[in-house]
Amino acid sequence: MLPFFPEPSLSYTQQNRTAVLLLNLGTPDAPTAQAVRPYLKSFLTDRRVVELPKWLWYPILHGLVLTLRPKKSAHAYEKIWFKEGSPLEVYTARQAAALAKRMPDLIVRHAMTYGNPSVADVLSELKAQGAGRLLVIPMYPQYAASSSGAAVDKVCEQLLLQRNQMSVRTVSRFYDDTGYIDAMKNHILRYWAEHGRGKKLMLSFHGVPQKHHDLGDPYPDECRHTAKLLAEALELTEDQYVVSFQSQFGRAKWVTPSTQDLFGKLPKQGVTELDVFCPGFLADCLETMEEIALMGREQFYEAGGKSYRYIPCLNDNPDWIDALVALAEENLGGWR
C-alpha cells in the first residue's frame, strides 16, 4: 500500500488555484436509524468530542449509545428533514454556492467533519481541480476544540496523506466579527418587524462540558462576548436578554445556564413571552429546528409560557453572505 495518495498529473500553473472550504459538523445521509448509527459512531469516537479513555467510553458507546440513540435521533431528524435532504447540508451547500457566485475566481466547496460530503472526498476533488492553496472556514464563530478543532483535525489528516501538500490557512474564530454581528442584528430586527417581539430574547449556544472550559477551552467566554456585542447592537438592556447553553449529553457537568432548564424557570419568574435565537449556529439543523423550535416550545408552554418565537439561523441570508465574503477576503490576503 502506498504511503501517500497519487497526485493528479497537473503542471505547476495548473496547481496554482485557490479554494475556500466551508466546513460544518455533519449529518446522517437519511433520517433512518441505519444512517444515523455510522454518523453517530464517527462523531462520538472523535477524541475531540468525548475526552474519555477508550477503555471507559467505548463499552458505553457500543453497548448503550449506538444501540439506543440511533432510533431516537432518526425520529427527531424525520421531523425536520427537507425534500432536498438534511437542513444542515442544504443550507451549508447554499452558503457555499452563494459564496462561489460572489467570488468566481475561487473554487468554493463545502464539506462535513462527519458524514458527507466528506473532507477526504472534497479535498481530493479540489486537488484534481488544481487547488494548491486552501482557506478553511469552520462554520463556528466561537472556537471550541470539539467543533472548530475537530474540523481542522480532519483537514490535517488529509494533509498527512498528500505527497504534494496544499498550502492551508484556517479561520479559527470570528465571534466578534463586525459583519457577523451586523448580519444577526439585521436578521433579528427584520424578524421582529414581521412577526412581533417577546419580552425577552434568549441567545442559546451549543453547550460544552465544564471540564473543557476549565482546561482552557475559550468557547463559553467567546459565546458570552458574542451575545454582549449582539445585545448592544440591538440596544437591549441586561434584563431584556439571557445567554444559555443547550444540547447537553451524558452525565458530566456542562457550562450553565442550561437552555432547557431556563425553559422551565423563566415562566415562573414572570417571563411568559420569549424569543429564541441561536448565534453559534450559522445554519439550521437538528439542534435548532427540533430541540429549540419544537421541543423548546413545548417545554416553555408546559411551564406556563404564553408566547414563544424561534428566530431561524442566518442560513443563506444575504447580509450573512456579505459578511462571509468579507471574512474570506480578509483571510485570503495575497492569495487572490
Swiss-Prot record:
This is Ferrochelatase. Its EC number is 4.98.1.1. Belongs to the ferrochelatase family. InterPro entries: Ferrochelatase (IPR001015), Ferrochelatase_AS (IPR019772), Ferrochelatase_C (IPR033644), Ferrochelatase_N (IPR033659). Keywords: Cytoplasm, Heme biosynthesis, Iron, Lyase, Metal-binding, Porphyrin biosynthesis. Fe cation binds at H206, E287. Pfam families: Ferrochelatase. Pathway: Porphyrin-containing compound metabolism; protoheme biosynthesis; protoheme from protoporphyrin-IX: step 1/1. It comes from Neisseria meningitidis serogroup C / serotype 2a (strain ATCC 700532 / DSM 15464 / FAM18). One of its GO terms (cellular component) is cytoplasm.
